[in-house]
């Protein structure tokens, strides 16, 4: 399940930047955007399944950290969607980019810090 979740995230980020480049070039990116929305569903479902599996074995305060990681992951997905929707409507995206980047850094940090991830920190 972990590999499916990581693959879905990788494809989601690739599709996000492809859709962003299409919208910024003035072309229609609806098809790529819809594919990205499908990836959102896969990311959320696999992430929730991982979360529920972890909750069966997690001890002490790990419940809180994995819950925060899940919330940050949902914020990343929300940030991605808001950036693309605002781009398609030709509105300013500065604040939404900030949300996206802060949440993405938080997700990567927690993913590397928590016991299931790589032990970098």
UniProtKB/Swiss-Prot annotation:
Matches recorded under InterPro entries: UPF0344
Domain of life: Bacteria
Keywords, sorted A to Z: Cell membrane, Membrane, Transmembrane, Transmembrane helix
A family per Pfam: DUF1516
Example of a GO cellular component annotation carried by this entry: plasma membrane
Membrane topology term: Multi-pass membrane protein
Similarity annotation: Belongs to the UPF0344 family.
Protein name per UniProt: UPF0344 protein BA_1155/GBAA_1155/BAS1072
Native species: Bacillus anthracis
